[in-house]
């Protein structure tokens, strides 16, 4: 059985090969989430955004507004704690075509409520 992160990386590559408008934005976690597979396959469409979760969302919405399909790759804890307001205000309320990929959520991946609360 493949690790979930390998499936994620392989899926991003398949999406990128199928559609030239697919971009992957990463929050400095490509090795951990295996988004680096997309970076190797489609380097011109891989954007390393660094650790700036709120800005990460804004950039993705801007790219979506001009026809790209951004796929965001980040740890779940950062989506739920650092970027929930921009997700609600910029993505959900505007119906932006932005895809969220949140890795390592839950006790099985080492991120329990006691560690993030």
Give the residues covered by each predicted segment.
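Thiamine diphosphate
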Residues: 1-117
């Amino acid at each position: 059985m493949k690790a979930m992160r390998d499936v994620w990386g392989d899926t991003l590559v398949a999406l990128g090969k199928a559609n030239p408008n697919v971009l992957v934005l990463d929050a400095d976690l490509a090795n951990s989430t295996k988004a680096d597979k997309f970076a190797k396959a489609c380097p011109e469409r891989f954007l390393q955004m660094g650790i700036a979760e709120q800005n990460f969302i804004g950039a993705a919405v801007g790219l979506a507004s001009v026809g790209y399909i951004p796929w965001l790759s980040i740890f779940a804890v950062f989506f739920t704690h650092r970027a929930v307001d921009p997700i609600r205000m910029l993505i959900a309320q505007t119906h932006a075509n932005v895809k969220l990929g949140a890795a390592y959520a839950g006790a099985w991946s080492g991120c329990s409520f006691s560690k993030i609360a």
